[in-house]
Regions:
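Acyl-donor-binding surface of acyltransferase catalytic domains
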Residues: 2-93
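Internal hydrophobic scaffold segments of catalytic domains
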Residues: 1-16, 45-54, 59, 134-167
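A conserved beta-strand-loop-helix scaffold within acyl/acetyltransferase catalytic domains
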Residues: 93-188
Length: 188
């Protein structure tokens, strides 16, 4: 209401200062949990916003699938295109060690790739390091996360895969684990 009174015709959000932080609402699959540090909201938020007249403008996709299902769905296609990909790119496991050793290059790469996205707000390297440094790198799976580099060693792309940390996040009491403390290498 305040924004309308100020003359706003459109409001986009939520954006928590930058798109590197919480910047979206979840609309479905609440039973699936969330990735560590992924935005989370109660299921009823979307109905409140709809009643206020807000509409969905942009969507995002998070995939919650067992690894074997993903392999079955894309395995044959990947094997078919792999020889062509390997003519131009090296495909290797993305490890926390590579991530941390190449954080400045990853910062520039992420800025370049996402810079044209809606509401993208650049952040300083120091902020990137705080959001995407060691505690971030220790959460993704180094066996299934993939790094693509050009033949001369430049970062060409990557995707990160996370285990299902929901059981850990449900632990309460003295043995509870915060999202910030999750570490893939720990034998929970």
């Amino acid at each position: 209401q305040w924004a309308q009174e100020q003359g706003a015709k459109h409001i986009y959000g939520p954006i928590n200062f930058t798109t590197f932080a919480a910047n979206r609402l979840r609309l479905d699959h609440f039973e699936r949990g969330a990735f560590p540090s992924e935005p989370w909201n109660p299921p009823y938020y979307s109905s409140i916003l709809a009643k206020l007249g807000y509409k969905i403008r942009y969507r995002y996709l998070s995939t919650f699938s067992p690894l074997n299902d993903i392999i079955a769905a894309i395995g044959q296609d990947y094997l078919r295109v792999k020889p062509k990909l390997e003519q131009h790119f090296n495909l290797v496991a993305m490890t926390p060690e590579f991530w941390l050793a190449n954080l400045p290059e990853l910062y520039g790469f992420v800025d370049e790739v996402f810079g044209a996205n809606f509401a993208y707000t650049p952040i300083s390297f120091e902020t990137f390091q705080a959001h995407c440094g060691e505690s971030f790198a220790l959460k993704f799976c180094p066996k299934t996360s993939v790094l693509a580099t050009t033949k001369d060693g430049r970062i060409a792309g990557f995707f990160l895969v996370y285990p299902d940390y929901r059981p850990l996040m449900r632990i309460t009491g003295e043995h509870s684990i915060s999202a910030a403390a999750i570490n893939y290498a720990e034998p929970y």
